[in-house]
């Protein structure tokens, strides 16, 4: 075989070893790294989502508490200025619960809890409207308050909110744990892959 042919074959092998292989491994390493980062971002986005859901649920829960406190203040004083927070909160409540439902529409269990919150809140609002009408007519509201119906309805609203937030907090803890695990195995996997690539290039 002519020497030039041998030299050409050797040159191609050297070129493949010193240029093509490192370039291919570099591209493969980049793809692996991008895949790991994309997966990690996805996991962290769900953590952030749960945090937003919990924050929104707490806001809506406070809105409900403001309505209850405002209504109680009016029943005690008869001053309609006490109803301003109640009126404003009532105008927002329906829309805020709808937005909360949209945030968890991928989770049937949480979506059902929002429906139960809405039902409990609507029942309380019916009671509140009845109490406010009685007070406006200067009718006796003592018996209505003493019946305990308002307290029971308020407790039910709070219980439903607490169950929703507790369930979402459990999801948050699971997702936080998952994100830590992903970070751990991602770093270990990438280091192992890098060592394998380095070994192949050195071989």
Identify the role of each PLM range:
Residues 3-11, 36-48, 68, 128-191:
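Juxtamembrane amphipathic/coiled-coil helical coupling segments that flank
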Residues 78-80:
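Short loop-to-helix capping motifs
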Residues 21, 25, 90-91, 193-196:
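Transmembrane alpha-helical core residues of multi-pass small-molecule transporters
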Residues 2-3, 7, 99, 103:
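Juxtamembrane segments at transmembrane-helix boundaries
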Residues 196-203:
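Cytosolic-side ends of inner-membrane transmembrane helices, especially those
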Residues 63, 74, 83-148, 152-156, ...:
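Heptad-repeat alpha-helical coiled-coil/4-helix-bundle sensor or tether segments in soluble regions
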Residues 15-67, 103-121, 182, 186:
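Amphipathic alpha-helical segments and their boundaries
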């Amino acid at each position: 075989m002519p020497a030039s042919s041998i030299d050409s074959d050797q040159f191609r092998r050297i070129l493949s070893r010193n240029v093509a292989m490192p370039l291919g491994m570099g591209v493969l390493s980049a793809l692996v790294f991008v895949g790991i980062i994309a997966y990690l971002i996805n996991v962290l986005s769900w953590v952030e989502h749960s945090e937003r859901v919990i924050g929104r649920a707490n806001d809506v829960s406070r809105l409900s508490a403001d309505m209850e406190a405002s209504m109680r203040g009016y029943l005690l004083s008869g001053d309609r200025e006490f109803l301003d927070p109640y009126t404003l909160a009532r105008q927002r409540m329906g829309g805020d619960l709808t937005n909360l439902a949209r945030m968890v529409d991928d989770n049937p269990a949480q979506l059902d809890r929002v429906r139960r919150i809405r039902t409990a809140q609507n029942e309380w609002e019916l009671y509140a409207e009845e109490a406010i009408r009685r007070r406006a007519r200067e009718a006796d509201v003592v018996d209505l308050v003493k019946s305990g119906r308002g307290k029971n309805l308020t407790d039910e609203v709070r219980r439903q909110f607490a169950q929703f937030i507790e369930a979402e907090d459990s999801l948050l803890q699971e997702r936080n744990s998952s994100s830590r695990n992903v970070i751990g195995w991602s770093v270990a996997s990438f280091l192992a892959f890098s060592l394998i690539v380095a070994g192949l290039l050195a071989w």
